[in-house]
């Protein structure tokens, strides 16, 4: 669907060019988040020329529609489609990539900006190699979602935290949670604010403001 802040504007598939453009031309918005798919990219392209953050959660397999309409027969052709999102990352931006998918990791070289990996396992080899070079990563360790830059680690929150536990019970996948955290961090949002945002997910703006004011003393 299509959301603006907490307002649900439409229930239909909003991944198309028209809905994306609708958000981009809205002067009341400071940021927008878009989801897309290989078919949408091939049929319409993306509504933006560059982006601050590009997230790739997995390398999809081809489908009969993609094969029939666009001759996407296998992994090599699919890579040329999915790389579009990474190609558009600004030099001052970041590509957020799933380190658990080797094909996604292979897109890192295409980013003009920083690369930030996420994985459930702190010992993921791609993630570990990235950290050895001073890179940033997000992962789970002893039940804590953890931020790392090189060998420096920050425990953000435990998966048992009330709101997180509830969302996971309702079907939120841990990989999605890690991608969300990594995206927020790549945008320069502080760990404190990321934690507060997740803790207060779905609450009204006034209540969130009160909680943040309380945290700031």
Which residues are covered by each model-predicted region?
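Conserved nucleotide-sensing/catalytic segment adjacent to the nucleotide-binding pocket
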Residues: 3-48
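Acidic, Mg2+-coordinating active-site environments of NTP-dependent enzymes
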Residues: 43-216
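Anionic-ligand anchoring segments at beta-strand to alpha-helix junctions in alpha/beta enzyme folds, i.e.
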Residues: 1-3, 205
């Amino acid at each position: 669907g299509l959301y603006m802040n907490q307002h649900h504007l439409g229930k239909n598939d909003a991944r198309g060019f028209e809905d994306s453009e609708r958000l981009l031309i809205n002067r009341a918005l400071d940021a927008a988040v878009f989801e897309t798919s290989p078919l949408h990219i091939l049929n319409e392209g993306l509504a933006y020329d560059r982006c601050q953050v590009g997230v790739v959660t997995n390398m999809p397999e081809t489908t009969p529609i993609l094969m029939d309409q666009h001759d996407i027969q296998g992994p090599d052709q699919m890579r040329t489609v999915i790389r579009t999102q990474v190609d558009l990352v600004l030099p001052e931006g970041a590509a957020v990539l799933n380190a658990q998918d080797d094909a996604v990791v292979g897109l890192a070289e295409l980013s003009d900006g920083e690369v930030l990996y996420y994985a459930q396992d702190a010992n993921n080899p791609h993630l570990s190699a990235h950290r050895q070079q001073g890179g940033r990563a997000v992962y789970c360790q002893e039940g804590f979602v953890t931020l790392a830059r090189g060998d420096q680690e920050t425990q953000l929150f435990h998966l048992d935290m009330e709101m997180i536990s509830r969302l996971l019970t309702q079907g939120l996948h841990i990989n999605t949670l890690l991608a969300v955290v990594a995206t927020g961090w790549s945008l320069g949002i502080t760990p404190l604010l990321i934690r507060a945002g997740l803790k207060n997910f779905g609450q009204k703006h006034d209540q969130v403001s009160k909680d943040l004011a309380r945290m700031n003393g």
